[in-house]
A protein has these predicted regions:
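Conserved catalytic-core segment of nucleotide-activated headgroup transferases in glycan assembly
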Residues: 1-37, 41-42
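Acidic, amphipathic alpha-helical patches
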Residues: 48-51, 112
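Acidic donor-binding loop of glycosyltransferase active sites
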Residues: 53-69
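Nucleotide-sugar-dependent
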Residues: 64-74, 93-95
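Short hydrophobic beta-strand element within catalytic cores of glycosyltransferases
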Residues: 82-87
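A charged, aromatic-enriched C-terminal amphipathic alpha-helix characteristic of glycosyltransferases
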Residues: 107, 121-157
Length: 157
């Protein structure tokens, strides 16, 4: 409901709104009227290939965190070059992950809409693809610390 309220405010403000398609991925839902002839269209749950294709074709996204651990969708969107709005939660702030992430402390619908408008007003047809946060993308040993934990636990057994 929060994101829908923000999208409705953004639709009211965005001058070139007819140029934008607004999608929702995840749980399937009926289309949602956002005003000015625009609808939030559900694409439902996507395969990994469909998800990657959607990210490749997207310019902006919103993915809010609802728990203190980092949410993967904002990270995934950002490495695909999508400008993504997310929020801080407790001690988590993803703003330093890369320059495609806009991390908000204030997630009121009007504040989200304002940030989305800024992003969309700076739209460029061709978005240069840069390797952002290469360590995150290439790290083959993400859970290297598990070996150390096992050694500690085995010592105590």
């Amino acid at each position: 409901k929060l994101i829908v309220a923000a999208l409705r405010r953004w639709v009211e403000q965005q001058q070139d709104i007819e140029e934008w398609t607004i999608l929702s991925a995840g749980e399937q839902h009926a289309k949602v009227d956002l005003g000015r002839g625009k609808y939030l269209q559900s694409v439902g749950k996507l395969t990994l290939q469909e998800y990657a294709k959607t990210l490749e074709e997207s310019y902006a996204g919103i993915s809010l965190m609802a728990s203190p651990h980092p949410s993967y969708p904002p990270l995934e969107m950002s490495v695909f070059g999508v400008k993504v709005i997310t929020n801080t939660f407790a001690n988590k702030d993803l703003k330093d992950f890369n320059s495609n992430i806009v991390s908000l402390n204030n997630i009121s619908p009007s504040h989200i809409a304002k940030e989305l408008k800024k992003i969309c007003d700076n739209y460029r047809m061709i978005v240069p693809h840069e390797m952002t946060n290469q360590e995150y993308c290439d790290n083959e040993n993400v859970f290297d610390f598990i070996k150390e934990i096992k050694q500690i636990l085995n010592k105590d057994a």
